[in-house]
């Protein structure tokens, strides 16, 4: 199911997807990427994504999205890759509460919130497990409207190999610290 609606640049809306059975799907990465004109998404909150390992670029460059459905209860326990997840969602002011997502297996968070330049705050992702993450490059790069971040000082960054431009172009003064420096 990866890239199923990818590059539908003029698509403004989608039909009801709530009844889609994706319980055996392992990759939904890029499903809505490059849907530049998509304003909102149908309800996908009840999707069973327990077997999904890849959601990279799921909403990548959905420039016109002004809100997202509630994806807070998704079972993310098998996901390994969230890079480019919300990349370029320039009009999103807030995100669903993804604070309880299971991030134990995630290795790549790079560019996840890149250029979400209307976001004022993020859900409390301070309890995300990051001990398997190896890349957080540009994770918050271009989030120029952020006035605060959750306390990510408890993130375990000991295995991170790539971390350049994490807060690049975050214009507001953010008080930042991490648990360890590798």
Predicted segments, located by residue:
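Negatively charged
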Residues: 1-182
């Amino acid at each position: 199911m990866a890239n199923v609606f990818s590059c539908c640049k003029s698509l403004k809306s989608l039909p009801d997807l709530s009844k889609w059975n994706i319980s055996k799907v392992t990759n939904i990465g890029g499903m809505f990427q490059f849907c530049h004109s998509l304003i909102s998404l149908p309800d996908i909150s009840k999707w069973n994504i327990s077997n999904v390992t890849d959601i990279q670029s799921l909403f990548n460059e959905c420039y016109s999205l002004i809100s997202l459905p509630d994806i807070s209860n998704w079972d993310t326990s098998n996901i390994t890759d969230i890079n480019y997840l919300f990349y370029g969602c320039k009009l999103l002011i807030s995100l669903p509460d993804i604070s309880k997502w299971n991030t134990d297996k995630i290795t790549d968070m790079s560019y996840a919130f890149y250029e979400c330049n209307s976001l004022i705050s993020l859900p409390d992702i301070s309890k995300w497990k990051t001990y398997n993450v190896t890349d957080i490059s540009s994770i918050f790069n271009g989030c120029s409207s952020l006035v605060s971040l959750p306390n990510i000082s408890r993130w375990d960054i000991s295995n991170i190999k790539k971390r350049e431009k994490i807060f690049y172009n975050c214009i507001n003064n953010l008080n930042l610290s991490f648990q360890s420096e590798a």
